[in-house]
UniProtKB/Swiss-Prot annotation:
Record's keyword terms, sorted: Cleavage on pair of basic residues, Disulfide bond, Ion channel impairing toxin, Knottin, Neurotoxin, Secreted, Toxin
Domain of life: Eukaryota
Organism: Californiconus californicus (California cone)
Taxonomic placement: Eukaryota, Metazoa, Spiralia, Lophotrochozoa, Mollusca
Family statement drawn from the similarity comment of this UniProt entry: Belongs to the conotoxin O1 superfamily.
Name of the protein: Conotoxin Cal6.1d
């Protein structure tokens, strides 16, 4: 239940700023949760 990786991000940082509900996983923004 993941979308394709989006904007780059830092692991352990706040949720991705460009959209709510995104989480940082493996250096990329993923919707909702990590796989």
């Amino acid at each position: 239940g993941l979308t394709r990786p989006s904007k780059r991000c830092l692991a352990g940082s706040a949720p991705c700023e460009f959209h709510r509900g995104y989480t940082c996983c493996s250096g990329h923004c993923l919707i909702w949760v990590c796989a």
